[in-house]
Amino acid sequence: MFSSPLKAYRRLVASFTGDDIQRQARKLAQEISWDAVIPGRPTVLVARRAQFSKDVEELRNHTNLNFAAISAVKIKKAQESWVPEDLRQQTYFAALLRADPELLRKLEAFGRAFLINASRRVRIDAVMAANFDYWQDEAIKLGCAALGIPFLVLSRENYTIPWTSPWLHQRIADAKFRFHGSGVACFSHATKRAMSPGVANPDDIWVTGAPRYDRWLNIAPRPASEKTYVTLVTFNLPGYGAQDLFSEVLAQFAANSAAEKGKGVTWLVKCKKRADYEEIAAKVPNGHALALTYDTPLFELFPVSRLVIGYNSLALVEAMLTDAAVVIPWWGQPKADPSQFLLDPNDPAIAEVIHIARSPEEFAALLQRAAAGEDLKRGTREQRRAVFSRHMQLPQQGTASQAVEEFILHYVAKAAGSR
């Protein structure tokens, strides 16, 4: 599969000298942010990514660890001049490298030089990334192994939609992938099962939950007078497989916003990112009274929402940690296979905590009831948290941040004991 690209890679890497490697490594090490590093604490160098950064921020605020950071994009770009584009394949890259000792040697030299240069500022006790199989992390894993530094993962991937686990198992088998780091922390037991074929010892996969949700656990219910939002979480992207449904939902949502204008309710469309925001802004009907946002945190938005509308989205799982009512629009549905859904509307446990609008008329009626101030919340706190726990581990005691701290310190101590 990789024979021609591998030959090209060998030629390219052969031309990349030891001085080139050292120069690239020094340059990359200068990009590390050492903000708020406290002397005497273990220091973890993290490869900063979207979402993952939310977990790191919680860890920084609620553990006794330092977290220095470097952009994962910069780690990737530092290697692009000598790793051909057609070889930069997630999951597959690790086995490919191990087909040639010379390639391994140069990657290890780069990773090792980067870590040595970084450690001249502050000793690095562990490195932590957001994925266990990204190609650009292989050099850092090799450098960590050479220097006796634990390479850890706090996985931002969470394989709780049923089809994703067999898909990952097959991908791991096809790629002959093995994780060459020290340990993986993940958010759910389903994710541990999904990742297990790629990790030599399943005990090195810890189920910790997600630190970003620690602050959600003690959200106090807001009085009805403060619940002034009706919130639509967008699902217009092709991956949802429900673009026509979203168009109908958006049109009805906009119509209600116009009809209820000036009555003290904000009809908010929560977009995923700026591009999503611009697309939605261009298609909303004239005369609406919608507010659009892409950067308002759900943590702030859901507690003041009377109703949250969404479809096959982690945002609806997150809403289970609040007392916001939730509705899934469910008509003209092309995806009938339950394995495709994060929350299956035909599951009785889901229907106990979430409204399922099976027609446009049912959906419109729920919007009207929310506008009138009716309390539409379904399910008890325990039922809602049980649904959340299907997808994200909730600690029996303590916090996810504490569980991740324990995970990190375990491997730091293990590495220290083997030196």
Give the residues covered by each predicted segment.
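Catalytic binding pocket for nucleotide-activated donors in carbohydrate/polymer assembly enzymes
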Residues: 199-202, 207, 285, 314-392
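C-terminal alpha-helical cap of glycosyltransferases
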Residues: 394-419
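N-terminal subdomain of nucleotide-sugar transferases
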Residues: 1-78
